[in-house]
Amino acid sequence: MARKTLRARRFFSLIFPFFFITSVYAEQTPESAKTVTVEAKNEMFAPQHPDQYQSWKATSEQSAREDALAEDPRLVILWAGYPFSRDYNKPRGHAYAVTDVRETLRTGAPKTAEDGPLPMACWSCKSPDVARLIQQEGEDGYFHGKWARGGPEIVNDLGCADCHNTASDDFAQGKPALTLSRPYAERAMEAIGKPFDKAGRFDQQSMVCGQCHVEYYFDGKNKAVKFPWDEGMKVENMEQYYDAIAFSDWTNSLSKTPMLKAQHPEYETWSAGIHGKNNVTCIDCHMPKVQNAEGKLYTDHKIGNPFDNFAQTCANCHTQDKASLQKVVAERKQAIHDLKIKVEDQLVHAHFEAKAAWDAGATDAEMKPILNDIRHAQWRWDLAIASHGIHMHAPEEGLRMLGSAMDKAADARTKLARLLATKGITHEIPLPDISTKEKAQKAIGLNMQQINAEKQDFLKTVVPQWEDQARKNGLLSQ
């Protein structure tokens, strides 16, 4: 009886603040990104919102770099011919958003504004300067050109104006004033029946995160960001959308498969999981309310692992202790990891077997159904593994996608075995040594010494010029 009473008190202590918040913000009308005057320098808001600013700044403490390719060299083969085969680190704090996109080998080593391998769109989730440029130049103007064009303009790390209408009266009065600062995100939410200006408070909290933590692609000649949600947000829906427009991110250099590269579909996978279905938002788990030294509540902007603030996050809903929940999460993470590796092994073999089939004289017609299976298998695998935290957000959906990927990869290999047999090849296709990142990169023909040297020269010569120009133009604090 005492236990039930305690739970009841706890329930009402949680629910009453929610009713209060709803009433306070019920009359808020979020302003469109098109009407916001964007101030991109985050430190400008420190005097007005000191606790939020200092906690945001503390994301710089999340500085460790984890090399995903070194941890799992199979990825190099799966992404052969694509910049991700050069460099792929696991995510770290928001304070490194601009630094990391400059330093990754994926963005190349451009010498001029018209040089380099990637488009302007690659800045889109890195800085409030993006919203500023879209306001100044329009979307077509912003997306036009190469990534290097944005170097002197996009200089402030992901921050205040990415999620808040910092020019609004509501923000000046200390209210969140949430906004979608990217018009393409606004359109995507409308496509799934969630117009931002009609969404409830809790929906909006996750939608602002869903501007960036999503799957997207670069559309048309201008390489504009678009979310592939026209048919829905499930892996099969997005696959259907991409297939219908014959889109591919690149062609795998081994198998010649037109591939899809998933980005970071946290919004989609969260929506498919128990937290999303019950509207437990990104904010509830990753940005909880905490107290400052004076006992005042504020939203912690040091976005991180919910277990780091267990009492303010998980314990609000769960009765289990921290160790018990950590054990559950670890078991789910391991199950997804184990299936992930099995799928990768199948895909690695499929890419090399497809190469052997081409080398043996296979025709486009013979290879088409096989390449389609490889494309669909790797897409489903990638959407599962690119969603960092799927073991927490939607473990069942993660396992389902990986199981489907395994089936598709097995189909491809069965068809390849039959095709190879018609070419007189009945032995197992040997794999090169891909036991380390370096060996795998050598196996696909990457000259990493040259790539790294070019990048270091870029960082020493070009980036300082970008920063000097930004300071002269008043875009970056001295």
Curated annotation (Swiss-Prot):
Xref: PROSITE patterns: MULTIHEME_CYTC
Chain residues that bind heme c 5: H275, C314, C317, H318
Sites where the protein binds heme c 4: C282, C285, H286, H393
Pathway(s) served: Nitrogen metabolism; nitrate reduction (assimilation)
Catalytic activity, EC: 1.7.2.2
Locations listed in the record: Periplasm
Cofactor(s) in the UniProt record: Ca(2+); heme c
Keyword tRNA processing set for record: no
Enzyme class: oxidoreductase
Residue sites binding substrate per the record: Y216, H264
Signal peptide span: 1-26
Manner of cofactor binding, per the entry note: Binds 1 Ca(2+) ion per monomer.
GO annotation (BP), single: nitrate assimilation
Catalytic reaction equation(s): 6 Fe(III)-[cytochrome c] + NH4(+) + 2 H2O = 6 Fe(II)-[cytochrome c] + nitrite + 8 H(+)
Superkingdom: Bacteria
UniProt-annotated binding residues for Ca(2+): E215, Y216, K261, Q263
GO CC entries: outer membrane-bounded periplasmic space
A GO molecular-function annotation: iron ion binding
InterPro entries for the chain: Cyt_c552, Cyt_c_NO2Rdtase_formate-dep, Multihaem_cyt_sf
Chain positions recorded as heme c 2 binding sites: C160, C163, H164, H301
Binding residues for heme c 3: H94, C209, C212, H213
List of residues binding heme: C122, C125, K126
Family classification: Belongs to the cytochrome c-552 family.
Matches recorded under NCBIfam families: cyto_c552_HCOOH, PRK11125.1
Physiological role: Catalyzes the reduction of nitrite to ammonia, consuming six electrons in the process.
Name of the molecule in the record: Cytochrome c-552
Gene: nrfA
